[in-house]
Amino acid sequence: MEAEVTSVLLAAGLSPEDYRPHYRCPLCQDKGYTLSADGRRVRCVCQAVQHADRKNAGVPLCSFAEFDAMAFPAGPQRETALRHRDLLRRYADRFPETDKQNFLLLGPTGLGKSFLLSCVASALRDKRTPVRFVTAYQLNCDFRAQHFGGPDALSALIRVPFLAVDDLGTEPMLRNITIEYLNTLVEERLRRGRHTGVSTNLTPGQL
């Protein structure tokens, strides 16, 4: 059987290696665990590395697997939450070849916007995609520090392949800083084709 498969692959211009799965972690084959000598599951070292990577990028430890549809009332609200989960999971799976480059999560508190944004950032980080997750307040602090001679935070924020900004609109408005720096960040990321996700409690009119 294996010889037949190899023959078909070669005829198609492929090799047996193209047919075999390619794992990011050869130790656990991307399962997240290995088996000890007595058969117990042991957390793979790759999970600790991913945990450290997420922490360094400011990414909360959330995952789509933890999404609990029962947390939402049965009916339209739950259906909407599930639809948003599926859309964002597909966004993360297809990154960077996404249907839309950017996304904005709108709505009042309690709809899971921050959680879903965190799930996207975490999933991308697990794929070794450079990610930055910041709250709007943190972003504003970085802008203010740079404006008064501090480190250049804007350049790194512009370059990162995926930027997640949580709770836009909760930050204080600083004259000549908040709007001006945010506009520069958004315009430069759009110009360079970078992907961005934002969550906010503001309405479209307030934005």
Spans of features found by a protein language model:
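Short glycine-rich substrate-engagement loop in P-loop NTPases that contacts/grips substrate
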Residues: 74-85, 125-160, 172-176
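Pre-Walker A (pre-P-loop) alpha-helix and adjacent loop at the N terminus of AAA/AAA+ ATPase modules
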Residues: 66-103
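Walker A/P-loop nucleotide-binding motif
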Residues: 99-116
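Interdomain "pre-motor" coupling segment immediately N-terminal to P-loop NTPase/helicase cores
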Residues: 14-59
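Loop/turn-to-beta-strand initiation segments
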Residues: 129-130, 159-162, 192-198
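P-loop NTPase Walker A phosphate-binding motif
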Residues: 115-128
